[in-house]
Amino acid sequence: MKENLILKESEVIRILYPPGIVQTDDCYLDEEGRIYTTDTICEGTHFRIEWSGPKEIAQKLVEVNVSDIAAGGGIPTKAFLNLGLSTQCSKEEWILPFSISLQESLSSYNIELCGGDTYRSSSLNLTLTLIGVTTKPWKRSGGKDGDFLYLTGSVGLSLLGYKILKEGLDIPEPLRSLALERHLTPKARLKVSKELSKNSPVSCCMDLTDGLLLDLPKLASSSNLGLKIDLEKIPILSNILTYLSLGEVLSSGEELELIFLSPVELPKTLCETSLTKIGNTTSDWKGVKFFQGNSEKTFEHLGFEHF
């Protein structure tokens, strides 16, 4: 394939919508307060069957979709599943353990499986659609000048887990287990989202799926604001920078952490999850600028692309 024929995910999305229509949120909100999302995970793009078993794949499928609902300020209630099954998926060794894990993951969020479709595929393709409810929806376009930028948890673990599996990096415990867990079975921050929705003003929110270097510009663009990021405030677990460069950490995708704007100072922990203020919005420029002290920094790594 010629290089100029390879489109970025954002370009594909723009082409699909009619001229003048811009969809920047991961969820759709209807007039009755229902919130919808759908996400697909594909063999070779989002997981490898030599690394992930049916249990882990089912968990990841649920979590990435729940994460979208959490980023929209909603609570998931119903699910529809489309399964593209390859010839390697036998009933006993794959479909049954996948089904058990899927039901356990959905039940943990009180989500009802309502229907779907199955088909034969050359490789595994799994799509989950979630419907939820919300009384305080969060749109990416809701950011205001002077808002504080917050990040839940920490970043870098997912990419480190990928490198452990792909390159055989020798990482000591407990960092090794934390990295593998984040890469193979990341967890949505739904509890944090619920608590914020109840008690704290949130201007806008998104989940971290493509890395900070790609996702932060999306947030800034949607609210037509600039973001000033303090690199020294970004939460990175001890010793990760021994194995990854800072640019790689900022490119780590599928972390499923929440990035959100709020006009108020928030506590440093919520639902046993850290909340870190890593920057603020500004009307002085558009886009994202990273600072280390008073010096602006730029990075070559751009984050996780789906194409």
Swiss-Prot record:
Pfam families referenced in this protein's UniProt entry, alphabetically? AIRS, AIRS_C
Residues annotated as binding Mg(2+) 5 are D210
Q: What is its EC number?
A: 2.7.4.16
Question: Quick one: which residues bind Mg(2+) 4?
Answer: D26, T37, D68
UniProt: Mg(2+) 2 binding residues: D39, D68
Which residues are noted in the entry as Mg(2+) 3-binding? D26, D68, D207
PANTHER family, per the entry: THIAMINE-MONOPHOSPHATE KINASE
Catalysed reaction per UniProt?
A: thiamine phosphate + ATP = thiamine diphosphate + ADP
Q: What is this protein called?
A: Thiamine-monophosphate kinase
Entry keyword set? ATP-binding, Kinase, Magnesium, Metal-binding, Nucleotide-binding, Thiamine biosynthesis, Transferase
CDD domains on file: ThiL (cd02194)
Query: Where, by residue number, does ATP bind?
Result: G116, D117, R140, T209
Q: What does this protein do?
A: Catalyzes the ATP-dependent phosphorylation of thiamine-monophosphate (TMP) to form thiamine-pyrophosphate (TPP), the active form of vitamin B1.
GO terms in the biological process aspect are: thiamine biosynthetic process; thiamine diphosphate biosynthetic process
One Gene Ontology MF term: ATP binding
Q: What else is known?
A: Reaction mechanism of ThiL seems to utilize a direct, inline transfer of the gamma-phosphate of ATP to TMP rather than a phosphorylated enzyme intermediate.
Organism of provenance: Leptospira interrogans serogroup Icterohaemorrhagiae serovar Lai (strain 56601)
Family statement: Belongs to the thiamine-monophosphate kinase family.
List ligand-binding residues for Mg(2+) 1. Answer: T38, D39, D117
List the pathway annotation: Cofactor biosynthesis; thiamine diphosphate biosynthesis; thiamine diphosphate from thiamine phosphate: step 1/1
